[in-house]
UniProtKB/Swiss-Prot annotation:
It holds the Pfam family His_biosynth. This is 1-(5-phosphoribosyl)-5-[(5-phosphoribosylamino)methylideneamino] imidazole-4-carboxamide isomerase. The active site is at 8 (proton acceptor), 130 (proton donor). CDD domains: HisA. One of its GO terms (cellular component) is cytoplasm. One of its GO terms (biological process) is L-tryptophan biosynthetic process. It is found in: Cytoplasm. It catalyses: 1-(5-phospho-beta-D-ribosyl)-5-[(5-phospho-beta-D-ribosylamino)methylideneamino]imidazole-4-carboxamide = 5-[(5-phospho-1-deoxy-D-ribulos-1-ylimino)methylamino]-1-(5-phospho-beta-D-ribosyl)imidazole-4-carboxamide.
Amino acid sequence: MLIIPAIDLKDGKCVRLKQGRMDDSTVFSDDPVSMAAQWVDAGARRLHLVDLNGAFAGKPVNGEIVSAIAKAYPDLPIQIGGGIRELDIIEQYLDAGVKYVIIGTKAVKEPAFVEEACRAFPGAVIVGIDAKDGMVATEGWAEVSSVSAVDLAKQFRDAGVSSIVYTDIARDGMMQGVNVEATAALARESGLPVIASGGVTNMDDIRRLATVADSGVIGAITGRAIYEGALDLREAQTYCDSIA
């Protein structure tokens, strides 16, 4: 299981939001590239980048920073989400050295786009499913739909999706612990590899997630916990390696 540091980009800076609220952000660094360097030095094997401005604007806003991080670490798999709603944007990111793109809102509103993207860019597409009480949220979490997370994931089982990033938005940035049961259930019922996100707080969460790795949980994204020191990235990754 991979422990994946999150670098959330807002106005060119590395921030964390609480429950997706743009007006409730904490700036962790003015230099996201040096932030990436810190996590690479701590043993990160993949980075999770989010263009927060892009998620709300519906198109990339912090693309230059994403490209700079990809250029600085050409051998490091990077996944990017936020405002990816066109095939040419996916192409731009992949050309810049990003390995995976995360399709969120567009996957809910236009599932055929995911299939089209998977055909055009095999192995590079991740679907981001953000859920509140099991129901999918879109538009930077501003809207909650009538589609369940499990039903949405099942739609993409045969599309060629690389994995699902599943975020429980009630827990994101709140340091309340990860929703292990819902994450494992999504992996089992969809048959797709799932990366957990939202609420990864400490080593207890990592240990609990590791117990369901056999269900198809292949990674955990962590943000606030590693920035504030509640979780040590190297310790968490070493633990996961030791039980694999």
